[in-house]
A protein has these predicted regions:
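Formylglycine-dependent sulfatase
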Residues: 2-429, 437-458, 472, 487-517
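A glycine-rich phosphate-binding loop feature that marks nucleotide/adenosyl-phosphate handling sites
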Residues: 476-481
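Bilobed periplasmic-binding protein-like "clamshell/Venus-flytrap" ligand-binding domains
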Residues: 457-475
Length: 517
């Protein structure tokens, strides 16, 4: 067995020392473990989700209680993660289903060029198209390892045996190069096998709290528990991968990063910019590199901070790797326990996600979080935030919960639930997260918050201008002009023309004649 490669905490203290270490054999391994649409883990006190592997990593490393993605859809969130840049800085990659810009590099590509053995299983970056100049597929997260399969426990769980594929990756390792592996589960992305949670001993009464923007009934609770089953599938493979890494003597010097691309795939969560949309679980473990492990931090951190953290750990810079300058910040002050936080604010935003509006229009939002306040600016409030009703609210994945909310519109007593998830929104929103984590009470028109509203609006726009956001320069329409690579592109226009284009992620019952009572 090869001797373990160590990088001491003293080396991590300075960029010069790190660069020196990176030229030798002491660079840390990197293990990224990303769930698909997971907003919950047991370590955060969720009694109906059991994640012993995640919880163990958090207890042996750092649990981040205020980690966020800036853009809560798979492709743009993952683009931010692998580049260290906010989505409005990524041109086409700000959108869902884009063509990834050929001149924007990912950190796994940079690590591969510097001698790392890279690979991934499951879902890397996507959905979208990423190609080299010759038309071949780019390995944005490494070489694909998806050949090993399993018999899924439910019809909603993917057949890829993630842990076994990590084993296949290790078989090709030369035992000299440092490792960089991406475990990208496709769970808990929809669809689910409705009611499968009962086979795993789960009961609707297990749910301690249903968000205030959904009906609290057995159907919704069952949907939540089916989602929990898939998170637990992710966690089981996480545990197996950690055991395998330990068995080859490499866990001690591996930076293990466990997170999700965004929040849960339910109405008013995934695809929006509320707390449940953008807040993500995050635990980082590095046995020989984190000072005072077992900590919990409330520092505001972004998924854009992961790439600069990794680059600092391995001793590389953007300039020498050809990566674009990163807007994210290294987490080393937190890992070293030398600072309580790295920033007092976070920026959020989205552009075009799934189709379903005329001409494939997006729903542009920008936002900022500071001092437990969330400010959002909706730049096209006349557009439907969840997608047009008559084309199935395509920006919300089909589900039993979504069906319940569409039904709620027809009942005067529950119509407000439909308004919260599907209805039109004002130009500005402001929420006090310390008292209203569900983001129900919009304070934008409250005189008591007028000064906060003005200050947050000004700070957000100033910081976005500094980052070169086209929307701050009057060029925001460029995001709608970028090609849409989804097979359901121009869905609204095609439906209106009498076609029946594919709509895999929504149900036929989602199509809603808004005038119907």
């Amino acid at each position: 067995m090869q001797a373990r490669r160590y990088i001491s905490l003293s080396l991590a203290a300075g960029a010069g020392a790190l660069a020196a270490a990176a030229t030798g054999t002491h660079r840390p391994n990197i293990l990224v473990c990303m769930a698909d649409d997971a907003g919950h883990m047991g370590a955060y006190g969720t009694p109906w989700v059991h994640t012993p592997a995640f919880d163990s990593i958090a207890s042996r490393g750092i649990l981040f209680r205020n980690a966020f993605t800036c853009n809560s859809k798979s492709a743009p969130s993952r683009a931010c993660f692998i580049t260290g840049r906010n989505s409005w800085q990524l041109r086409e990659a700000a959108n869902h289903w884009p063509a990834f810009p050929a001149d924007i590099r990912s950190f796994p590509e940079a690590l591969k060029d510097s001698g790392y053995y890279t690979g991934y299983t499951g879902k890397g970056w996507g959905p979208g198209i990423a190609q080299n100049a010759d038309g071949s597929e780019r390995e944005l997260t490494g070489k694909k390892f998806n050949s090993r399969k399993l018999k899924p426990a439910t019809t909603g769980i993917n057949k890829i045996d993630y842990a076994a594929n990590f084993g296949e990756y290790l078989k090709g390792w030369d035992h000299k190069s440092p490792l960089c592996f991406w475990y990208g589960a496709r769970e808990p992305h929809r669809g689910y096998e409705y009611g499968s949670s009962a086979r795993f001993g789960k009961h609707p009464a297990d749910i301690d709290s249903v968000p205030a923007y959904w009906p609290d009934n057995e159907t919704v609770r069952t949907d939540m528990l089916d989602y929990a089953v898939e998170i637990e599938h992710f966690d089981r493979h996480l545990g197996r991968i950690i055991e395998m890494l330990d068995s080859v003597g490499e866990l001690e010097n591996t930076i293990v990063i466990v997170t999700s691309d965004h929040g849960m795939p339910f109405p008013r969560c995934k695809g929006q910019e509320y707390l449940a949309s953008c807040h993500v679980p995050l635990a980082i473990m590095w046995p020989c590199g984190i000072k005072n492990p077992g900590r919990v931090t409330d520092s505001l951190v972004s998924l854009t901070d992961i790439a600069p953290t990794i680059m600092e750990a391995v001793g590389l810079t953007e300039a020498e790797t050809g990566m674009e300058p990163m807007s994210g910040r290294s987490l080393f002050p937190i890992l070293n326990d030398t600072a309580a936080g790295i920033r007092p604010y976070l920026l959020l935003g989205r552009e075009r996600h799934d189709p379903g509006r005329p001409d494939d229009q997006g729903y542009p939002i920008r936002g900022i979080i500071r001092d437990n306040l969330l400010y959002l600016r909706n730049y096209e409030p006349s557009r439907w935030p969840a997608g047009n009703p008559e084309t199935g609210y395509m920006d919300v994945d089909g589900s039993h919960t979504k069906t319940e909310i569409i039904r709620a519109r027809r009942n005067p007593a529950t119509h407000y639930l439909w308004e919260l998830s599907m209805g039109l929104r004002p130009e500005e929103e402001l929420y006090d997260l310390s008292r209203d984590a569900d983001c129900i009470t919009n304070l934008a028109a409250d005189p008591a918050y007028a000064a906060h509203l003005k200050a947050l609006r000004a700070e957000m726009e100033t910081r976005l201008r500094a980052e070169g956001d086209p929307r701050m320069e009057g060029r925001g329409d460029i995001f709608d002009r970028y090609p849409n690579k989804c097979e359901s592109h121009q869905f609204y226009n095609r439906v209106k023309a009498g076609e029946k284009p594919p709509h895999k992620w929504i149900n036929d019952s989602d199509f809603d004649n808004y005038g119907q009572k």
